[in-house]
Amino acid sequence: MVIVAHPDDIEFGCAGTMARWIQAGATVCYVLVTSGDAGIADLSLSREEAMAIREKEQDAAAAVIGVQEIVYLRHPDGMVVNDLALRKQLVREIRRFQPEVVVGMDPTAVFISEN
């Protein structure tokens, strides 16, 4: 199971490892806290339109390596709060999927926007 904040975090982080694990027979599930609705260059799009695009892109990228399940929690991009509600959602997905390994992003890594 991979838990990340945004679509494309996995592709920039651990998709190669996930591809190898899937080729070796593992089942991988992605859990995305947001749908990346604020992280799109076309400012004419509504958040809902951006969300649909980002999710479609993530679905396509995951399909390339054989990921069969993606869970979108759809918290507002850029406004995620580490609260009890989020933790309950994450625990629910972990209990449901029962992964042997949970992969996440490095909490000390900082993304610097080029915009």
Predicted features, each with a name:
Residues M1-Q98:
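Active-site rim/loop-helix segments in enzyme catalytic domains that contact anionic ligands
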